[in-house]
């Protein structure tokens, strides 16, 4: 409520639809807040900014770079991010397979967070579709190669997916 204007949101293709959809679905709540709290409705608006590979944001010493990565044939575009601030570099792979473009941008990062996914042979036998999901991500071996090639000061894993051989029922 203390924001002095609209919220600026940066995103890939589709961000305009998300901003417009959010504006539409929050109308009842927004109307109440405008009436009850005397909030300027324009301060509740989302202003979308579409980005592609390259510099997304560069202001007051903070630089954010989108790095196109490979998250599968049908999931395009997909981006990793490099954040530079006060002489430090943070890189986050987001969802990706092994990717040379990411490796080039992640050299000697202070912090490099990379996703990883794996499954046992029993998982693939019990659920052949599991291979489709796993093929969209970096394997533990891939991530080991990435960290060896980029030599970050701190390497971390995220999106730790280890699919079980048999799906667990819900409920």
Where are these regions (language model features)?
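Binuclear metal-dependent hydrolase catalytic cores
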Residues: 1-91, 169-171
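Cap/insert and terminal regions of metallo-dependent hydrolase folds
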Residues: 9, 80, 89, 97-171
């Amino acid at each position: 409520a203390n924001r002095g204007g609209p919220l600026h949101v940066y995103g890939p293709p589709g961000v305009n639809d998300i901003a417009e959809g959010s504006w539409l679905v929050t109308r009842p709540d927004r109307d109440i807040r405008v009436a009850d709290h005397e909030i300027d409705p324009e301060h509740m608006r989302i202003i979308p900014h579409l980005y592609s590979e390259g510099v997304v944001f560069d202001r007051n010493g903070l630089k954010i770079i989108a790095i196109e990565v490979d998250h599968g044939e049908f999931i395009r575009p997909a981006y990793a991010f490099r954040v530079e601030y006060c002489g430090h570099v943070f890189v986050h792979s987001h969802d990706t397979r092994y990717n040379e473009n990411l490796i080039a941008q992640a050299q000697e990062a202070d912090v490099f967070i990379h996703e990883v996914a794996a499954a046992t042979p029993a998982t693939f036998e019990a659920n052949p579709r599991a291979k489709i999901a796993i093929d969209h991500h970096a394997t533990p071996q891939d991530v080991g190669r990435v960290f060896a090639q980029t030599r970050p000061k701190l390497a971390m894993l995220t999106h730790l997916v280890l699919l079980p051989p048999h799906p667990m029922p819900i409920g």
